[in-house]
């Protein structure tokens, strides 16, 4: 067993290399949860831990975000499974994750053409997902039965030191099949997620039921990890131990923005929760006062058509642009001058964290939960005065780095946007404070906190 020393909260902690197993519903989506898991898994693997990701329904689809070749990926929906050290793993390609699965009995997809190959193939073929398909005749484990039975068998074969659920369907069964191993529930949403998602008097009982089922499930875990201080006392009523660990910055280090481009961006799914219609409405005011500035929104979702119609109706074509999903979001941050967010609620807004690492001023609705733990509001007067950037870097913890706006207050939102657009000095000062505050979210800081938690459970 290998031992290392890391610094957590200014203390030197000795860690042993661990076998860590994550469970998640899917990896093919471009959401924040998938992005964060890929970053954490890659970092933990680079620090000597053996990391496995059990995916409930990958179905041969390619993970949206890159996964390190040393990370095991197990597709629980596949009929065959081969694990590290298993004879059928020997033929896996060097650039594929160590765990190999088949997406269909005896059929693999060629990475170049996507064409099918039959089970008569001499060796498995690495798919576009970086997952090698195991022929039906290979010496591999056949996965049968319910999800519970499949997960139990996978835990037995992987033999992890600690099991982590991202609170998908597996959250109710993982402790029962973990064989006494420490289990951690990691929740990426606010406690009241279901009440907000299923609003209205008729759906209230269903929201209560979903919330109650989750509370009951996490009560069986050794630790619950939440993203915000706001939710700590709530979860402590339902789980024996609760910790708050921020999400890390998930974008690769890049060029800090010069804040010179007359361009602001928003990032997120085009869905009701993100509430981009308010942002577009606010921009109709901004476009009159600051006509040479533009807004670009990155994301996709069911409301794309409605947003395009709103943009056209308000005469904002060319001023507000829907850019879809991009994998290199880092370059977009580097070439923008502010990050805008109008969510109705959040778990922990990853876009704000990412943008702060590129030195962008942040403007957000003060929704529950998360923004107020990332943004220090500059107030009506700008709040920063003529404080030099060097001083801001030393006092990042409580130095204004943007604006918090009451939810639904479109006019105030537009006013705050115009302030940053029209005042170069204010924009630079807020950006410097934003960059300085981002040290709390560096991957190294966050991964050390996770290592400390895992070690304390062993």
Language-model segments: which ranges?
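Membrane-proximal helix-turn-helix segments that form the acceptor-binding/catalytic region
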Residues: 152-153, 204-223
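Conserved donor-binding/catalytic core segment of Leloir-type glycosyltransferases
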Residues: 256-274, 280-283
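Conserved acidic donor-binding segment of nucleotide-sugar-dependent glycosyltransferases
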Residues: 376-410, 419-424
């Amino acid at each position: 067993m290998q031992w290392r020393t890391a610094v957590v909260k200014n203390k030197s902690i000795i860690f042993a290399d661990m076998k860590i197993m994550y469970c998640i519903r899917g990896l093919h989506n471009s959401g924040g949860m998938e992005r964060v898991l890929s970053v954490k898994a890659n970092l933990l693997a680079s620090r000597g831990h053996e990391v496995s990701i059990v995916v409930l329904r990958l179905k041969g689809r390619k993970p949206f975000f890159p996964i390190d070749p040393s990370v095991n990926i197990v597709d629980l929906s596949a009929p065959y499974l081969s694990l590290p050290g298993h004879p059928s793993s020997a033929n896996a390609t060097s650039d594929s994750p160590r765990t190999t699965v088949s997406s269909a009995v005896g059929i693999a997809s060629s990475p170049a053409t996507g064409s099918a190959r039959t089970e008569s193939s001499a060796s498995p073929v690495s798919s576009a997902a970086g997952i090698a398909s195991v022929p039906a005749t290979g010496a591999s484990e056949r996965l049968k039965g319910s999800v519970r039975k499949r997960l139990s068998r996978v835990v037995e074969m992987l033999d992890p030191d600690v099991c982590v659920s991202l609170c998908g369907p597996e959250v109710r069964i993982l402790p029962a099949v973990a064989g006494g191993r420490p289990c951690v529930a990691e929740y990426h949403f606010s406690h009241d997620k279901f009440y907000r998602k299923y609003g209205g008097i008729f759906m209230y009982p269903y929201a209560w039921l979903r919330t109650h089922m989750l509370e009951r499930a996490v009560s069986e875990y050794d630790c619950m990890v939440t993203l915000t201080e706001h939710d700590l006392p709530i979860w402590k009523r339902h789980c024996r131990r609760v910790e708050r660990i921020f999400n890390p910055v998930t974008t690769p280090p890049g060029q800090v923005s010069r804040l010179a481009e007359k361009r602001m961006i928003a990032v997120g799914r085009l869905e009701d929760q993100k509430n981009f219609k308010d942002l577009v409405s606010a921009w109709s005011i901004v476009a009159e006062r600051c006509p040479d500035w533009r807004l670009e929104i990155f994301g996709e979702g069911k409301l794309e058509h409605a947003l395009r119609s709103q943009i056209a109706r308000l005469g904002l074509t060319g001023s507000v642009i829907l850019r879809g999903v991009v994998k290199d979001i880092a370059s977009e941050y580097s070439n923008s001058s502010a990050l805008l967010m109008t969510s109705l609620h959040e778990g922990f807004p990853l876009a704000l964290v990412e943008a702060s690492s590129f030195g962008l001023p942040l403007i957000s609705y003060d929704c529950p939960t998360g923004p107020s733990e990332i943004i220090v509001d500059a107030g009506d007067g700008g709040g920063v005065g003529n404080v030099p950037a060097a001083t801001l870097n030393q006092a990042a913890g409580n130095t204004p780095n943007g604006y918090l706006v009451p939810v639904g207050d479109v006019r105030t939102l537009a006013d705050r946007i115009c302030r940053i657009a029209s005042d170069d000095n204010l924009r630079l000062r807020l950006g410097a404070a934003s960059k300085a505050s981002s040290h709390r979210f560096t991957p190294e800081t966050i991964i050390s906190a996770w290592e400390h938690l895992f070690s304390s459970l062993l």
